[in-house]
Amino acid sequence: FGNNILDIGSGAGFPGIPLALVSPKKNFLLIDANNKKIIFLNHVKINLDLENVDLLHKRIEDLNNVKFFDTILCRSYASLKTIYSNSINHLSENGVIIAMKGKYPHDELSALENLSKSIRFTVKRINVPKLSAERHVVIIYK
């Protein structure tokens, strides 16, 4: 994961908040375009005393100052192509983008490959106990 982690479209804080709880020495930036969600996350941050979490009310494509992150996480944010295009400039050398998806994203992977044949990625199926729906994680390497 590295030490600097960005959670795009954090919403209610998943996966950023649970990861910050179990990784207190890592730095997390949770961003979301919805200010109500940021207000909620600030409440969670204060109540859980999460000093390793920063919050930002912004869209990733509006993040002007180029910060570099070792890992960029997203869940239900956008297509893989959009995720890659909007976040690759914020990824450190040898960093990874980890995108959570439902069913195997055939079309999204094709669109990502059409963007550049040099994009390297792996897809892993995840089994969630008591959940019959498909879940996959796509890891995109810089």
Cite the ranges covered by each PLM segment.
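Conserved SAM-binding loop of SAM-dependent methyltransferases across substrates and taxa
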Residues: 12-25
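Helix-to-beta-strand junctions that scaffold the AdoMet/dcAdoMet cofactor pocket
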Residues: 23, 91-93
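Conserved SAM-binding motif I beta-strand of class I
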Residues: 27-32
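Short alpha-helix immediately C-terminal to the canonical SAM-binding loop
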Residues: 37-39, 105
